[in-house]
């Protein structure tokens, strides 16, 4: 262990297997807080590689509480957060559109860290219970096609790093790997990331973690979502290869809006925005969800282009199917809680 830590202190890269060894020590509570802090900061200064990101993500998944679901059928669309945009809950809203398309969505998320309302906060405001058992999450995925997976419940071993992360007060590798560690075995994924320089690398990591197809995007304004404010950069992983692209809202028939047009509020305000979008209320909120749902449908392979994804998302919202998914989730959740 000391030899591996020294490699990082000396600015040497670790293999996936070496990183897995260190991460396992962390997640099993055997690495002291002092050594953990030194390791995380040395890794940050050196710069995290794809192998290192994959190694720590695999170790985190190995100790996670597993949620049973047929491998390769579900997807996730959560992002890293940390873009400081104070936007509404875009990926949570988009998740209901993806589910309405017949894609099982295992929505991995947490409470607010840097924004006023995280996905868990808005879900609770909507009446969605975030404290369900793994078998209940499986039931909802099967019956409704969408379930919320509260990160602290499915990753209890993260308790060993919470104090150190808080004390450091700066982003570390843990800010990047949250969306990589869904306890449901995914085959496709849409992942927003706040660092544009890591698009290609993160797409490679998703491939190493078993994704067949994935899109990693960084929106205009360096958002961890697709944005209407300008050029969106994204990496497509497919067939073992990564290709980089850009897309503007006008390319898919959507109107440009400044970032301020999609500012969110607290959980109550964001829940109201989510409902208004699923009702089809025109404006920047709706168009932002159309763009992000379009990317999600494209990442899943449900459509061949983002344009087709945007068009399908419009139909799923205007038909009421996306809104019905939210209603169904709450209805079937009552069955679970009554057991």
UniProtKB/Swiss-Prot annotation:
Binds 2 magnesium ions per monomer. Pathway: Amino-acid biosynthesis; L-tryptophan biosynthesis; L-tryptophan from chorismate: step 2/5. Keywords: Amino-acid biosynthesis, Aromatic amino acid biosynthesis, Glycosyltransferase, Magnesium, Metal-binding, Transferase, Tryptophan biosynthesis. It catalyses: N-(5-phospho-beta-D-ribosyl)anthranilate + diphosphate = 5-phospho-alpha-D-ribose 1-diphosphate + anthranilate. Its cofactor is Mg(2+). Anthranilate 1 binds at residues 79, 110. It comes from the Bacteria. Mg(2+) 1 binds at residues 91, 225. GO terms for biological process: L-tryptophan biosynthetic process. One of its GO terms (molecular function) is anthranilate phosphoribosyltransferase activity. Disulfide bonds: none annotated. The keyword Metal-binding applies. Homodimer. Belongs to the anthranilate phosphoribosyltransferase family. This is Anthranilate phosphoribosyltransferase. It comes from Listeria monocytogenes serovar 1/2a (strain ATCC BAA-679 / EGD-e). The gene is trpD.
């Amino acid at each position: 262990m000391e030899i591996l830590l020294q490699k990082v202190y000396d600015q040497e890269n670790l293999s996936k297997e070496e990183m897995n060894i260190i991460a396992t020590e962390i997640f099993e509570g055997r690495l002291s807080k002092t050594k953990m802090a030194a390791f995380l900061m040395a890794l940050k200064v050196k710069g995290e590689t794809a192998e290192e990101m994959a190694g720590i993500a695999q170790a985190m998944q190995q100790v996670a509480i597993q949620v049973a679901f047929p491998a390769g059928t579900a997807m996730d669309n959560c992002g890293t957060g940390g873009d400081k945009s104070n936007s509404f809950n875009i990926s949570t809203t988009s998740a209901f559109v993806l589910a309405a398309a017949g894609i099982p969505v295992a929505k991995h998320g947490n409470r607010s860290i840097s924004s006023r309302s995280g996905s868990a906060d808005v879900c609770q405001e909507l009446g969605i219970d975030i404290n369900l058992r793994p078998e209940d999450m499986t039931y909802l995925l099967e019956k409704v096609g969408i379930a919320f997976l509260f990160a602290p419940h499915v990753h209890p071993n993260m308790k060993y790093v919470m104090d150190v992360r808080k004390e450091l007060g700066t982003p570390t590798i843990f800010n990047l790997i949250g969306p990589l560690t869904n306890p449901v075995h995914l085959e496709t994924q849409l992942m927003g990331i706040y660092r544009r320089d890591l698009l290609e690398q993160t797409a490679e990591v998703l491939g190493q973690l078993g994704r067949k197809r994935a899109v990693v995007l960084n929106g205009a304004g360096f958002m961890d979502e697709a944005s209407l404010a300008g050029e969106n950069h994204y990496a497509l992983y497919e067939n073992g290869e990564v290709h980089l692209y850009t897309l503007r809202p006008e390319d898919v028939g959507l109107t440009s809006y400044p970032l301020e047009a999609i500012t969110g509020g607290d959980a109550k305000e964001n829940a109201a925005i989510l409902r208004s979008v699923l009702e089809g209320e025109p404006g920047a909120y709706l168009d932002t969800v159309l763009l992000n749902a379009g990317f999600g449908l494209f990442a899943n392979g449900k459509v061949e282009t983002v344009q087709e994804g945007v068009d399908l998302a419009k139909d799923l919202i205007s038909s009421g199917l996306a809104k019905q998914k939210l209603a169904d989730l709450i209805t079937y959740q009552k069955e679970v809680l009554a057991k």
